[in-house]
A protein has these predicted regions:
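Terminal targeting segments of Actinobacterial cell-envelope proteins
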Residues: 1-23
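Short, solvent-exposed mixed-charge patches
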Residues: 285-287
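Structured, amphipathic secondary-structure segments that form assembly/contact surfaces
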Residues: 1-6, 155-247, 255-281
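Juxtamembrane and targeting peptides
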Residues: 39-141
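Hydrophobic membrane-insertion alpha-helices, especially the h-region
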Residues: 28-40
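Conserved aromatic-histidine-acidic binding/catalytic patches
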Residues: 18, 27, 31, 130
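Core segments of small alpha/beta cavity-forming domains
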Residues: 109-186
Length: 287
């Protein structure tokens, strides 16, 4: 599932508005790749709501590690919570929207990959879990949460996922950017008059924005999004979340912690020079 890919670069995707594409479909009476590109971009923009952004900036990513804060099993308090909020809100590198479109992969050394641990059991809402109490474990858990929610193509499933995996004070079924993204995608496909929809959400790159103590991590995952109706459109979508370690009878699990969603990360086509320059590293699966 994970790993660096070296493939022939697809042709550039036209940057048309969703309204323009839908007008074209009405006039032509066909459902083509152009609509699919619009659907993919719809998800991309839905994952960038106003509450999910904390400012601009450009260039390299602002990775940060803080040694304060503690509290497995709670949302944190005092200076620890302040440090978590500051880390989550810290702006990340910003790129042009076109960076999310398929592009030529880099020939430069990508650096050491991030090895994601394997799940050891299935958790609430059918989400793989059992990841270790490490930054890599937090990243693997975030990837699993997003994959199950988005690939389901079901708002009911997405609601259940975030309800089961977010702590009180965190994203809800009504506010989570993942639910908003899926709702936008489903709205467009219903407008197109088809129920034949397949979504593949593959984590290919990632970075750890920072940590606060051993129990709080802000991992960021850069996914390849493939949306198929009659043809397939592809794009990149990135997500960062506050991941907080919670102990339980089975040892513990990473959950989405309380507070506003972190500043928006760069959604960059994986393995490009730009993806590497903003701090992303390839993801590989532990053997």
């Amino acid at each position: 599932m994970f790993g660096r890919r070296r493939e022939k670069a697809p042709r550039p995707v036209p940057q048309w508005t969703r309204e323009k594409m839908l007008a074209l479909l009405v006039g032509a009476g066909v459902l083509g790749l152009v609509l699919l590109v619009g659907v993919g971009l719809c998800v991309y923009y839905a994952l960038r709501p106003a509450h999910h952004s904390a400012g601009g900036g450009n260039g390299t990513t602002t990775s940060s590690t803080t040694g304060t804060g503690s509290g497995s099993g709670d949302g944190g308090s005092g200076s620890g919570q302040d440090a978590r909020d500051a880390l989550a809100a810290k702006p990340m590198a910003q790129v042009d929207d076109a960076a999310s479109h398929p592009s030529a992969v880099s020939t430069s050394p990508p650096g050491a990959p991030i090895v994601l641990p394997a799940a050891t059991r299935v958790g609430p809402a059918g989400v793989p879990t059992g990841y270790p109490h490490t930054s890599e474990g937090a990243m693997a858990q975030l990837a699993a949460i997003d994959q199950v929610a988005l690939q389901s193509g079901s708002l009911g499933t997405a609601h259940e996922v975030i309800t089961q995996w977010a702590m009180p004070g965190g994203p809800t079924a009504g506010t989570w950017s993942g639910v908003q993204a899926l709702a936008s995608l489903l709205t467009d496909t219903q407008t197109a008059g088809t129920a034949q929809l397949a979504i593949v959400f593959t984590p290919l790159m990632g970075q750890v924005k920072g940590t606060v103590g051993p129990d709080f991590v802000v991992p960021c995952v850069d996914f390849e999004l493939d949306v198929t109706l009659t043809q397939t459109a592809r794009g990149a979508v990135a997500d960062c979340q506050r991941m907080l370690w919670q102990t339980d009878a089975k040892g513990g699990r990473w959950m989405v912690g309380p507070g506003a969603e972190p500043a928006t990360p760069a959604s960059v086509w994986p393995d490009t020079d730009l993806a590497i320059s903003v701090g992303y590293r390839d993801l590989t699966k532990a053997s």
